Amino acid sequence: GRTKETLRSSQVTCRDIDGDGCIEIPEDTSSKKQSSEITSQNWVNYGNTVLSHKCYSFSCKRDGYILVIDDDDFSKVKANYDSESRKLTIIDKKNKSNVFEIVTLINSNYSVNDPKYKDYTMIMKNSGFVYLAKVNKSSDIDINIQTLKDMIKVY
């Protein structure tokens, strides 16, 4: 049955989030200060009656992706989402600078030659959508385009 211990409020389903072959459970860690379109999760695995931490993530249900964030960086960043431009911005809490941005576009609305996206790199293409990213190379939090390609997962 449902109890306080078994009820989860996370909209993200269980999955192998880190590629280790085991199914992890997402626990909702979203705060009221966070954009409503973005949720954050603490991923745990179950072993012999104990839940143990695996990793953290931000999820964007509207755009269909999960972004796995390194444990060391998770407490240092916050996520903002602009629903009009479909842009997720990860911000360094300490110096309030952008760490990186991810923009979601419908495939037919994207052109490599569009000057609006000249600073962005495609990190994923899925189900008619294109996901573009721009990293702040001068950020104290070291994340590059290749790292972002590894961090992003499809719902």
Please tell me what each predicted stretch does.
Residues G1-R2, S52-F58:
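Beta-propeller fold detector
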Residues T3-T13:
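Repeat-based blade/solenoid architectures
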Residues I17-T29:
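Acidic/hydrophobic-patterned starts of short beta strands in beta-sheet-rich repeat architectures
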Residues K32-G47:
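Structural motif
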Residues D70-M122:
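Secretory pathway targeting signatures of secreted, lumenal, and periplasmic proteins
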Residues D73, A133-Y155:
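Surface-exposed amphipathic alpha-helical segments
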